[in-house]
Structure formats: structure tokens, C-alpha cells
UniProtKB/Swiss-Prot annotation:
Swiss-Prot/TrEMBL keywords: Metal-binding, Phosphoprotein, Zinc
Free-text comment on this protein's domains from its UniProt entry: The N-terminal and the C-terminal half of the protein have a very similar 3D-structure, suggesting they arose from duplication. Requires a bound zinc ion for normal folding and solubility.
Family of the protein in this entry: Belongs to the UPF0587 family.
Protein's name in the database: CXXC motif containing zinc binding protein
Gene name of this polypeptide: CZIB
Length: 160
């Protein structure tokens, strides 16, 4: 199946360096089986810190899952070296923030939640534990004395 990029697009107000924080950051995804096309009904998360051995000693993956419909074992791996921040200059443009190595599982939807961080453009103030589940986030930068926000968060998957 190959590699699939997750691209993010958002409107940033007075913040930059929007990024997922830590190896325990949860990427909430809905997956599709590459064999039969079954799509998971529930959100599932994968984390960088999780590593599951593949059958037959073929390495490991962030998630290994048996399809409920066709019983095929599929896996997906977060490629840690591809995790990127979304910056002020990326404002309102799609940018790849992570790549997944997909072996039978294809992500079809993404739900950003808690665990993001960003910084004030002028002040460098760090805003941690940003939750993007509502696709919007607002706060106030005391140092810069201005409102900050992240709005209209959307995403797309691109096969590479």
C-alpha cells in the first residue's frame, strides 16, 4: 500500500510552530482495510511510543489489526522522521505534518484532539495542550497583549 501523508490546513492567528507533542501523542484515525474495503466505525489511535511485532518476524508497526470482515492482518507505522510543525508561513495552505507506512490499513479520516502545542509569533509564548477537536482554538497571549487562535482546521490524505 505504501506511504500516505496527512496534510493539515488551518488559519493561524498570531501563533506558529503548531505541532503534536511527545511520543504519546494520539493520532485519532478511521482505517480502511486494503483487502476488503471495510472502514472502522470507531476512532482508533496510534502513538509513536507503541510498537507491535509483526507475524513472522517482519519487524514492527505502531498498530497491527485483524480486519473484522476478512480476517486479514494489517498494520500501520508512524514515520517519526516525517513529523513536522505547521507554521505561520503555511497559513491557509495544506502542509504534510506526518507520513504513515501503510501495510493493508489505509487512514481515511483524522480527528485532531488534545496534545498539540504552538508558540506566539511575536512573544514566543508556548501554548501547550491545545485541543483541536472542535477544529478551532483561541487564547490570549499576555506577553504580546493580543488574541491568538487556530481556526478552520481541515485535513487530507495524500498517497506518496
Amino acid at each position: 500500500m505504501g506511504k500516505i501523508e496527512l496534510q493539515l490546513k488551518a488559519t493561524l492567528e498570531n501563533v506558529t510552530n503548531l505541532r503534536p507533542v511527545g511520543e504519546d501523542f494520539r493520532w485519532y484515525l478511521k482505517m480502511k482495510c486494503g483487502n476488503c474495503g471495510e472502514i472502522s466505525e470507531k476512532w482508533q489511535y496510534i502513538r509513536l511510543m507503541d510498537s507491535v511485532a509483526l507475524k513472522g518476524g517482519r519487524g514492527s508497526a505502531s498498530m497491527v489489526q485483524k480486519c473484522k470482515l476478512c480476517s486479514r492482518e494489517n498494520s500501520i507505522e508512524i514515520l517519526s522522521s516525517t513529523i513536522k510543525s505547521y507554521n505561520a508561513e503555511d497559513n491557509e495552505k495544506f502542509k504534510t505534518i506526518v507520513e504513515f507506512e501503510c501495510r493493508g490499513l489505509e487512514p481515511v479520516d483524522f480527528q485532531p484532539q488534545a496534545g498539540f502545542a504552538a508558540e506566539g509569533v511575536e512573544s514566543g509564548t508556548v501554548f501547550s495542550d491545545i485541543n483541536l477537536q472542535e477544529k478551532d482554538w483561541t487564547d490570549y497571549d499576555e506577553k504580546a497583549q493580543e488574541s491568538v487562535g487556530i481556526y478552520e482546521v481541515t485535513h487530507q490524505f495524500v498517497k506518496c
